[in-house]
Regions:
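Extracellular/luminal regions of secreted and cell-surface proteins that mediate adhesion/ECM remodeling
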Residues: 24-313
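Secretory targeting and sorting signals
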Residues: 2-24
Length: 313
């Protein structure tokens, strides 16, 4: 339903808005963001080196369908989850600024436009109608208890991939409420980190507190974004920050996180949009039988971290 609605909304957006909105390929030079995906399991703000990637665990749960769940003893568990923190950073020249909007609460999702910072006077559009660029993205109100705010959907994807390149498991959760949650480890080398005053500083102050219309399912507009030199992360204990590995055989795999996979958001560079960690999975007492409990939790070891690379094993 959401996919169908998103397609219809994008068609309507193109027909009704694009004629009056400024074009992104004309006028002054724009300073664009560069989204860098951190390796999965690495806390926000770390360099992605393997010893620092400790923000993950193996969690047996009773209900395989629950968004979250208390980790329990394998003897009563029906599923095993690999939980991991995910983080995305902006290391570009300009902020990532996205405005979502819908006409009424009868629409389940909001269409999204990307606002671009000008390089001449530093101005940043202040709302949806002024934003220069239509996107294929949309926002959706996530009702799960740990969220209850508007998510930018399809922003990031998780996948467990075999050494032969076959995707074994993919994510359910791929939406984010974006804001400035941490400083990137190499912020000192970036030329356009917000200062103390000006449009970038004003935007950063807003994004540091941005909760994406928390507890506001009837909102008609929402802001999502990340300033230069900042990043957004979701901790591994949050709803949907996991892959179900109950049926994954013993072996070596890549855990791959990818941001802006469809390139609907304009960036200076797409080469660093995926990062991976190589890991081994083994079942000391064999895999669970379908519908049964877990004989023993699998042993999972991180072998390598590969920042900016989609393959690692």
């Amino acid at each position: 339903l959401l996919k169908k609605f998103a397609v219809l909304a994008l068609v309507a957006l193109t027909a009704t808005v694009s004629a009056s909105a400024p074009r992104a390929d004309t006028g002054p030079d724009f300073l664009l963001p560069d989204l860098r995906q951190a390796p999965p399991g690495c806390a926000g703000g770390s360099s992605g080196e393997l010893p620092l990637c400790t923000a993950w665990d193996v969690c047996p749960v009773i209900d395989p369908a629950a968004p979250n769940g208390r980790c329990v003893a394998p003897s009563v568990a029906k599923a095993v989850r690999l939980r991991f923190t995910s983080a995305e950073e902006n290391v570009g020249d300009g902020p990532l600024v996205l405005y979502g909007r819908r006409e009424s609460t009868q629409q389940a999702t909001m269409t999204v436009r990307q606002a671009l910072r000008t390089g001449t006077d530093g101005s940043i559009p202040g709302g949806y109608r002024a934003a220069q660029r239509a996107t294929g993205a949309f926002t959706y109100y996530e009702p799960a208890l740990a969220h209850q705010h508007w998510h930018l959907m399809n922003f990031e994807h998780f996948a467990l991939v075999s050494r032969q390149g076959k995707t074994v498991v993919t994510d359910r959760k791929n939406g984010f409420c974006l804001g400035d949650r941490f400083e990137v480890h190499d912020a000192g080398r970036l030329a356009h980190v917000p200062g103390d005053t000006g449009p970038d500083a004003d935007l950063a102050a807003t994004l540091r507190e941005n909760m994406c219309r928390h507890h506001e399912p009837t909102a008609l507009e929402v802001l999502e974004g990340i300033s230069v030199g900042s990043g957004d992360d979701y901790k591994f204990t949050v709803d949907f920050q996991w892959l179900d590995i109950t049926r994954v055989p013993t072996g070596t795999y890549d855990l791959v996180n990818t941001v802006n996979a469809d390139r609907t958001l304009l960036e200076t560079n797409y080469r660093n949009n995926s990062s991976a960690v190589a890991m081994s999975i083994s079942w000391p007492q064999g895999m669970p039988e379908p519908g049964g409990t877990v004989p023993a939790a699998p042993i999972v070891r991180l072998l390598r971290s590969c920042p900016g690379q989609p393959r690692c094993a």
